Every structure is written in structure tokens, then in C-alpha cells.
Amino acid sequence: MVKYPSGSLAAFRKPVTTQKKMRTGKRSYTHKKGVNFSDRGMTLEQQINESNKYYLTEEIAVVHKKPTPIQIVKVDYPKRSKAVIREAYFRQASTTDYNGVYKGYYLDFEAKETKNKTNFPLKNFHEHQIFHLAECLKQQGICFTIIRFASLERYFVTPASFVINAWRKAEKSSMTLKEIESHSYEIKSGFRPTLPYLKAVDNFIADRKRE
């Protein structure tokens, strides 16, 4: 039996800081109407995973989803050479969803989605995720969140620095769609791979080089 956590988090009280403020590229790329990623019947995670398989096969990038840590509680040994897990708990993940290497750059990112049409709730980000992204930014990693507006069928690569700054503001409960449009890189439609997010990442990297 696998038991899911209650969702509670031990508070990280260590301040989330970066060595320097990073200006995000205020550029949004036109969304092509008539393209429906959701018609393919896949979740955002499935779309990213399928795209990552394509990138790996084509030797474009090596990006993997980090496994959720499991705490094993009870194990039976019906045979000497075979162990059966009878009870385990999903532990709280301590970092982000994905990481990898692309064109010599270290990538680290989250995948988030919402059914909202005008804003993205910041409560969808946990403190440990914000802390980890901030630490990776200190090492000059390419850090971001792939945000999906499910009702609008729109996808964005949103730089981590923008997300962190928004999350830190106590009075701010969400990022508006307009804010995300102006600070993010919209993912253009594609067939191979399913979600060609690295094209948006290319624009993100290019803007960072110009800063």
C-alpha cells in the first residue's frame, strides 16, 4: 500500500536569495490558433516526458524527470531472490520536477498548470521549489517553469527569477496572464516533439546573453 502525504511542508526559514537580480526578457511569442495540445489526451507531464524522449533520441538534449522519493515501511520476502514492498509512503520531493543538460547549459525546471484563464496562483509553488531554483540560479543555471493554461491551451517558459520575485511578495497571491505574457516565452506549436519547449528556451538563453 502506498500512502500519499498530507501535503503539509516543514517550513524552510532560510531566506531565499540570489547573488544578483536577473532581468527577465520581456518577450512573448505569438500563439498559433487552431492548435490543441490537449486533443492528444496527454497531461502536461506526459507532453514534457514525450518531448524529452524525442530530444534524447535525436541527441538534442538530455533531460529527465526526477523520481519522487519513497520511504519503504514494510517489505516481504516470499522468495530469497525476490522482495515485495507491502507498504510505502511518497516523501515530499525536495527539489524540482526536471533537470538536464542542453547545449552545455544546466537546465532545472518545474511543470505547473491551471484551469484559470486570467492568472496563475502562486500557491502552486512550494517553498522548497523556490529555494532550489534560487540556489541553481546562483550557479548560473537555466531555470524556469513550464506553465500551462489548460483552458486556453497556452504554454509558457517562465524564467525562475520572475517567479521567485513574485512569490516573495507577501501581498501577491497570483501572477496575471498579462504579466506572464510579458515576462515569458510562449511555446509555439509543434508535432515532433509534442511540446517543443526548447525553442522557447533558446530565446530565453539568447536574451540572457544580451543582459
Swiss-Prot record:
Per the UniProt entry, the signal peptide is: none
Keywords assigned by UniProt, alphabetized: Cytoplasm, DNA damage, DNA recombination, DNA repair, Endonuclease, Hydrolase, Magnesium, Metal-binding, Nuclease
Q: Which InterPro entries match?
A: Resolv_RecU (IPR004612), Restrct_endonuc-II-like (IPR011335), tRNA_endonuc-like_dom_sf (IPR011856)
List site positions: Transition state stabilizer: 112
Question: Where does it live in the cell?
Answer: Cytoplasm
Reading the lineage from the top rank, the first entry is: Bacteria
Catalytic activity entry: Endonucleolytic cleavage at a junction such as a reciprocal single-stranded crossover between two homologous DNA duplexes (Holliday junction)
Pfam families assigned to the protein according to its UniProt record, in alphabetical order: RecU (PF03838)
Q: What is its main location?
A: cytoplasm
The free-text cofactor remark is:
Binds 1 Mg(2+) ion per subunit.
Its function, per the record, reads: Endonuclease that resolves Holliday junction intermediates in genetic recombination. Cleaves mobile four-strand junctions by introducing symmetrical nicks in paired strands. Promotes annealing of linear ssDNA with homologous dsDNA. Required for DNA repair, homologous recombination and chromosome segregation.
Fetch the NCBIfam families from UniProt: PRK02234.1-5 (NF002584), recU (TIGR00648)
HAMAP family noted in UniProt: RecU
* Name of the featured protein: Holliday junction resolvase RecU
The gene for this chain is: recU
